UniProtKB/Swiss-Prot annotation:
One Pfam family from the record: DNA_topoisoIV
Assembly behavior: Heterotetramer, composed of two GyrA and two GyrB chains. In the heterotetramer, GyrA contains the active site tyrosine that forms a transient covalent intermediate with DNA, while GyrB binds cofactors and catalyzes ATP hydrolysis.
Annotated source species: Staphylococcus aureus (strain COL)
Primary localization: cytoplasm
Region Disordered: start-end pairs: 811-864
Species classification: Bacteria, Bacillati, Bacillota, Bacilli, Bacillales
Name by which UniProt lists this protein: DNA gyrase subunit A
Family membership: Belongs to the type II topoisomerase GyrA/ParC subunit family.
Amino acid sequence: MAELPQSRINERNITSEMRESFLDYAMSVIVARALPDVRDGLKPVHRRILYGLNEQGMTPDKSYKKSARIVGDVMGKYHPHGDSSIYEAMVRMAQDFSYRYPLVDGQGNFGSMDGDGAAAMRYTEARMTKITLELLRDINKDTIDFIDNYDGNEREPSVLPARFPNLLANGASGIAVGMATNIPPHNLTELINGVLSLSKNPDISIAELMEDIEGPDFPTAGLILGKSGIRRAYETGRGSIQMRSRAVIEERGGGRQRIVVTEIPFQVNKARMIEKIAELVRDKKIDGITDLRDETSLRTGVRVVIDVRKDANASVILNNLYKQTPLQTSFGVNMIALVNGRPKLINLKEALVHYLEHQKTVVRRRTQYNLRKAKDRAHILEGLRIALDHIDEIISTIRESDTDKVAMESLQQRFKLSEKQAQAILDMRLRRLTGLERDKIEAEYNELLNYISELEAILADEEVLLQLVRDELTEIRDRFGDDRRTEIQLGGFENLEDEDLIPEEQIVITLSHNNYIKRLPVSTYRAQNRGGRGVQGMNTLEEDFVSQLVTLSTHDHVLFFTNKGRVYKLKGYEVPELSRQSKGIPVVNAIELENDEVISTMIAVKDLESEDNFLVFATKRGVVKRSALSNFSRINRNGKIAISFREDDELIAVRLTSGQEDILIGTSHASLIRFPESTLRPLGRTATGVKGITLREGDEVVGLDVAHANSVDEVLVVTENGYGKRTPVNDYRLSNRGGKGIKTATITERNGNVVCITTVTGEEDLMIVTNAGVIIRLDVADISQNGRAAQGVRLIRLGDDQFVSTVAKVKEDAEDETNEDEQSTSTVSEDGTEQQREAVVNDETPGNAIHTEVIDSEENDEDGRIEVRQDFMDRVEEDIQQSSDEE
């Protein structure tokens, strides 16, 4: 049995072997496969493909050659890896949607934006593009170093001359071991302008460079949102750039719209993007899309059409598509490249500095090469001049020599010529002895002397060499530069907020006594005449009822003030939209209320930063406070203190004011005080406040509102038993803050205590809610106007154990006058309550919730006649009461 060759077996620790082998592998991937060189922006495989094309003479003016021939030559000579990796790299360089400036001119199927693969290499053909010649220009003039190929039988370039900044022009991406690179493409004109600026000012800042280089310029065009991501990437080498499709909303007749996408983000697969949209529509995550089709063609370019339903908001759908599909995506910049053979994270300026230094080296080495060649030629011409001056002696010497070697030696010795000069004389043809040829040699020699002087001047002065680099870059810019494709949109577009995805519409937010909250479109409720039955606004739990109601836009802010003096904030759209009969969700699921905390007031505000608005607070014990609205612009999720007060007190209401109004405070025993808001000094957010009204025993504040000085507004009073009236504000004289107030209604067993005191103009509608959850909407103008001491008229006939819980005013709409028979539909629920719905309101003014109680009425004619008679008797009683008061 033969013995094993022991000398070939080396025992090693497996840990050391794994460490060293993996390190060798990692360095091989990093240096020789995955990362581009900072000088020419190419990985080895791309560099070898382009050099192979150049060696095979596949220039733009020559015919196409089979891709298989190119791949085979590159694989056999320079790249000892699979043919598929070489072909895929070449295909990518030929795709105008992958490379901003394609380096390969492909003929045949080279793939598409839909992710279709290229045809097999035996079917496609390729050659270099014109701009590729600039990467290879002067490669044979000793401008770069050549190295041995993998088997030592060929030579290949270690880097290309790269006469334009290809690293940034076409970008690069690659995954190495422990690192990755992702560099976006840029516009060639901007890049060269940036290099020129850098060459003139080496201390230029990145901000100044960005005046020339606006940002990435993707081959698929599209939009870039904002410059903050670009600036961060240029300054640090890392950053995220938001890309967005270019889409327009077009009218398609019949009041319908469609979204047309004409440009998509870089590296987005169009087919998958369309599939994603279809999936979202199928899963009902995006509503309102009726049709989706791809109309892309060579004639129209990219064109994806999304038809929108007639009643849908196309802008909101588009914003949802941006957020949930690749119509908007980000490009993660990670500018890692090989610098002196080592991977390094570089910023924009460093990339341009390294490129500029490379160009200076290329031009310097080319100049040195040209100088050597020029001097060699001048040396030969000097020998020829000597020969022409001594032609007879030269001929005689040659004729006397027995061999070429003897003739060469004789010429060198006799005429002091070098070996090269002697050889050139021996190689000279007889026709060059003519006078014309003599003149040509003399002219060429003189030109060479001038050329040599120019080359030496370039090498002697760095600024002259730099100017030559500038001139050549300018020439390339003028030949190949083009307009920017990608538009950079400025101004807060980095991220889509939730608000951008929500249609702006008028809504009603209701809050029940047991703290259930929900929102509904304001069109859910329609106007009815005074005494109407009402619309079922919610199905409440046993002993629960609507206690707060406010109208606003989905994009407005809602401030929630609690009885404990705290404030919370939500956007209108953050309150869940539920059905009209739904009870809502627990308010603690929307805002983080503390124990025993109840919402006392909801206020809708458009601009929390306003310096012209104030909030006025009133507590049950008659304390008031005025504070600037801007103090409440930053409210945390868990709320903040809005007002401080004693333990036996609580917050009753808050009102939004302009700072120049009159304050009205009403009590349950029908006292009302009116005083100027200016008498309230603005206090901080957490301040306690001052006395607003002096209360009688057993009395408490139930209402707070504001009125303009000398206004024609009226005070609306509603009692718990469903009675109400209007009284001009001017019937209530101005008094000093802290007084007891004056009488605003006569309290009887029929009326009950006051539950609502607010101001109206007579042009509003009134939303009235009962503890049974019934909501009615009526015109304020239908409510009788009476004196201060009057009891009021019946607004709603309440059932047993019913009382008014909430009253809120909303903007009157002309559509409210539409005939009910034409516009409304009604159904009767199991409990006999009529439920009606009609789209009539477009309320643009956020309303204030009013801390009060509700209303109901009859439908048949007999009940209507009874109601009229009751109103007449009410007025008679009021007149009698007024006469008694005057006496």
